Amino acid sequence: MIPTSFPPREEIARLTARMLLEIQAVHFRPHEPFTLASGLPSPTYIDCRKLISYPRIRATLMDFLTVTLLRDAGFEAFDNVAGGETAGIPFAAMMAERLALPMTYVRKKPKGYGRNARIEGVMTEGQRVLLVEDLTTDGGSKLSFVDAIRDTGATCAHTAVIFYYGIFPETIGRLQAHGVTLHHLCTWWDVLAEARASDAFDAGTLAEVECFLSNPRDWQDARKPADPAAGL
């Protein structure tokens, strides 16, 4: 069923952050940083995949994402909902159900046998496709999925995520340059504010996280592993 009420953006962001904290999807570890896919260190990590195990929370967040899209993109803006492999697939299925639209998913790369396809499900030329993922950091992986969708002759001008890092200023511009608008529910800044309000972490940890969020590149550069070749 399509939601008919439209909560304020600020309330959606606050409640989304609260739910992520409640299920312990948020991890802050400034003194033993996580390693991102890029190889760079980060004191923050978020596991949106956990959401699928919490029916009330996942339903609420999908309602939030639905009303965000209806308000910002339009009520008749899409013909197909595509999930990005792997984390985006369950959320795309839930969004397709709410929007009463066909659902497909996009592989990261062709599987190498059979049809050797990147698109699974039925996607046809001219369809307006919404790309759904769990989160985005710098937007890079979204561009690959968008290109695969467009290669079918469909269009893709919107991507929707639950969580957007919101700390890399080039992200929005990169997506816009590719003709894609990003829709999201909350950012690290929303999570930090809610973490402070809930006393979920100690003050020292939150101060270090804020330092990272304010200038992630400098924080990472100061903590990158030393290059073994540098001393040769």
UniProtKB/Swiss-Prot annotation:
Positions of orotate binding: T137
Protein's UniProt name: Orotate phosphoribosyltransferase
Molecular function in Gene Ontology: magnesium ion binding; orotate phosphoribosyltransferase activity
Pathway listed: Pyrimidine metabolism; UMP biosynthesis via de novo pathway; UMP from orotate: step 1/2
Pfam families with a match to the protein in the record: Pribosyltran (PF00156)
Binding residues for 5-phospho-alpha-D-ribose 1-diphosphate: R107, K108, K111, E133, D134, L135, T136, T137, D138, G139, G140, S141
Gene Ontology biological process terms from the UniProt entry: 'de novo' UMP biosynthetic process; pyrimidine nucleobase biosynthetic process
SUPFAM superfamilies hit by this protein: PRTase-like (SSF53271)
Top EC class of this enzyme: transferase
Cofactor(s) needed: Mg(2+)
The enzyme's E.C. designation: 2.4.2.10
Cited function: Catalyzes the transfer of a ribosyl phosphate group from 5-phosphoribose 1-diphosphate to orotate, leading to the formation of orotidine monophosphate (OMP).
Similarity annotation: Belongs to the purine/pyrimidine phosphoribosyltransferase family. PyrE subfamily.
Residue runs in coiled coils: none
Keyword tags: Glycosyltransferase, Magnesium, Pyrimidine biosynthesis, Transferase
Transmembrane segments: none
Subunit structure: Homodimer.
Catalytic reaction equation(s): orotidine 5'-phosphate + diphosphate = orotate + 5-phospho-alpha-D-ribose 1-diphosphate
Gene3D superfamilies, sorted: 3.40.50.2020
Listed InterPro entries: OPRT (IPR023031), PRibTrfase_dom (IPR000836), PRTase-like (IPR029057)
